[in-house]
Amino acid sequence: MRVSIICAVVLAAVPLVASAQNQNAGRNLAASCAMCHGTDGRGATGYQPLAGMAKDELVRKLDGFRSGATPATVMHQISKGYTDQEIQLIAGYFSAQKK
């Protein structure tokens, strides 16, 4: 009985740890965006704010930059450096930030 309870508690905590790790990974990846978009994604003057943007919308934009379908200056080069999973993490981080 005790072992079952301990196992249940440990297994219940696993998603929380994974979620925290993803959030930290997203924040770490998003740090490279800070120069133009700010550390919190609110955007430096003249740059689009990313904070609070829908995750799917941001993923589409980054994919468009990466493929060259969306016009940009430096975002083509920057976005090509990220995997699909990293783009998901970055988009998740910025979508969770307050506008």
Residue ranges of model-derived segments:
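Electrostatic cytochrome c docking/interface patches
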Residues: A13-A30, G46-Q48, V59, G64, ...
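C-terminal capping alpha-helices of c-type cytochrome domains
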Residues: S67, K80-K99
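The canonical Cys-X-X-Cys-His
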Residues: C33-T39, I90
